[in-house]
Design a protein with these regions (language model features):
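Conserved beta-strand scaffold positions in the cores of enzyme catalytic domains, especially
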Residues: 9-12, 381, 439-441, 460, ...
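C-terminal helix of von Willebrand factor
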Residues: 16-33, 470-493
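Short acidic, S/G/P-rich loop/turn micro-motifs used as interaction or catalytic elements
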Residues: 17-19, 265-270, 358-361, 387-388, ...
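Conserved TIR/SEFIR loop-to-helix hotspot centered on a Trp-containing motif
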Residues: 413-434
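Glycine-rich, charge-decorated loop segments at or immediately adjacent to ligand/cofactor-binding or catalytic sites
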Residues: 447-462
Length: 507
């Protein structure tokens, strides 16, 4: 299942049995002869390009240099150049990790590695340099370290992108300025992990067909704001949520292909912290073809896994208890509602960001401040840059606006000069008055917003609609805006119904 169609068959072999080895060789030859790529005929000029690349002394060349080399050797067609690049990559002559589906980050496409050991040496230099920092460092620190090995800043950034592509490292922030290398985390869990007593905790977990190596490091990176360096290790992390006073032990077991979560602290805060944990795992799970099975572990029998889907099915059939067999063969009945009620969550609020494209750099500042709320599963911001290529943008915007729980408008002179923005604002006011959505607006520049019909009835952010230009410190302005939004989100969520438990949260 892991390798899909790449597995062509299985051949039983025994080193003492020459016939089985002969059979294996025959099978390999048969599969090689069936490969269409081996039958391809290459133009003579492609061999000249291959030889030229092999003779170069540089560690890597740029995309443009590669194209120039192709043209000098008679290959001027861009499509043929790209096709040849794919073959050169497969042959290990000029590696390009951004071609086709080899990498999502197209920045990798602009470098051809001619000496693989150059990449390997750079990676090992970073591993050695940041052992004492337990694998957490900044890009600037990486640039400084690799400069000692004659790597340019551009070379360092390329190697970091390559490490991220192969999940050797993970970003700790949106701008990828802070980096985590899981391989440098401690092998052993900290002593604090022993303080979690499953019999006294809210216990939850996931069962996987196979536990991928990158899953837990991605989770650690996504929830780094709730963890500390000394409470992270290769197979787990301890999180602490200051807003609820609760802590969580999240630990992976590769042999059992499962992740277990134990949450202690005030009862009323456990559900909220579990919601944050589940939200971040669901974001990660959305990248996988398989879906893990959500499980709960009764405090009275913390080693006994009960599938959430099965408990929900029992609850729908009006069953009130489920029988659990203990290790000593004793059978106890557990209340189903007690097991699944703590899993109920409030879905993240869908935010629609309404702004003028001329003020896009300012809306990006807001998105940075919303990121923490998004990672905590409180909000899901949407703006028109989310529209995918080929999608009709006007119907998509209208659909998202009508589906939003809260519309956030960035008011400015540019905003009121746009017919599209005005239409969005009118629709937002109508939905607010109809009780269909919340409206939050903040004033970016002096724009005469009080003259807009119906808008003067609302309290605008920040304090009394004071524009950015009237603040001595822009950071204080954005802090006032985000605190106002947080207050509105908290009020909206408090009035919202809790959603019943489900194995996977909706994204």
């Amino acid at each position: 299942e892991k390798y899909g169609g790449n597995i062509k068959g299985f051949v039983a072999t025994d080193c003492d049995d020459k016939k089985s080895i002969t059979q294996l060789k025959r099978k390999i030859v048969e599969e090689l002869q069936a490969m269409e790529s081996l039958k391809a005929r290459f133009p003579r000029r492609w061999f000249a390009i291959k030889d030229a690349l092999s003779q170069m002394k540089a560690e890597h060349i740029s995309f443009e240099d590669y194209r120039t080399l192709c043209q000098k050797n008679g290959e001027s067609d861009p499509a043929s150049q790209t096709s040849l690049a794919g073959f050169l990559h497969d042959l290990g002559i000029a590696l390009n990790y951004g071609l086709g589906n080899r990498g999502q980050d197209q920045r990798l496409r602009f470098n051809y590695v001619l000496k693989p050991e150059w990449v390997t040496q750079g990676i090992y230099a970073l591993l050695h340099a940041f052992v004492r920092k337990k694998g957490v460092f900044t890009r600037a620190e990486a640039v400084s370290e690799l400069a000692k090995k004659d790597y340019s800043p551009e070379d360092t950034h390329f190697i970091l992108e390559l490490m991220e592509l192969f999940e050797l490292s993970f970003p700790l922030d949106d701008r990828h300025n802070r980096v985590l290398i899981p391989e440098l985390l401690a092998d052993q869990q900290p002593k604090d992990a022993a303080s979690f007593k499953p019999a006294e905790c809210l216990n939850f977990g996931y069962k996987y067909p196979v536990l991928t190596e990158g899953l837990l490091p991605r989770f650690i990176a996504r929830t780094h704001h709730l963890g500390r360096a000394e409470t992270r290790w290769k197979s787990g992390v301890i999180l602490k949520d200051p807003s609820t006073g609760c802590s969580a032990l999240v630990r992976a077991d590769a042999a059992e292909a499962e992740v277990r979560v134990h949450i202690d602290g005030p009862q009323e805060g456990r559900r909220e912290l579990l919601g944050i944990i589940r939200f971040n795992f669901d974001v990660i799970h959305s990248d996988y073809e398989f879906k893990p099975e959500a499980q709960v572990y009764p405090p009275a029998a913390p080693q006994k896994a009960l599938a959430v889907d099965e408990l929900e099915a029992l609850a729908r059939s009006k069953a009130t208890t489920v029988s659990v067999v203990l290790p000593d063969k004793t059978v106890i009945d557990q209340d189903i509602a007690t097991l699944i009620d703590p899993l109920a969550t409030r879905p993240p609020l869908k935010l629609f960001l309404s702004y003028s494209h001329q003020d896009e750099n300012f809306i990006n500042e807001l998105r940075k401040d919303l990121k923490l709320m998004q990672m905590n599963g409180l909000v899901y911001p949407w703006h028109d840059r989310n529209i995918t290529a080929g999608e009709q943008w006007e119907p998509s915007i209208l659909e998202e606006l009508n589906a939003a729980d809260m519309v956030i408008c960035q008011l400015s002179r540019n905003y009121f000069a746009s017919d599209y923005c005005i239409a969005e604002l009118k629709a937002a006011i109508q939905r607010k008055l109809a009780g269909e959505a919340e409206l939050v607006a903040y004033v970016l520049t002096d724009c005469g917003w009080k003259e807009f019909p119906g808008l003067s009835k609302f309290q605008l952010l920040p304090t009394d609609g004071k524009p950015l230009s009237d603040w001595n410190d822009s950071n204080k302005y954005w802090r006032a805006v985000i605190e106002g939004i947080q207050k509105a989100v908290k009020k909206f969520q408090a009035e919202r119904k809790i959603r019943p438990a489900r194995g996977t949260l909706d994204m």
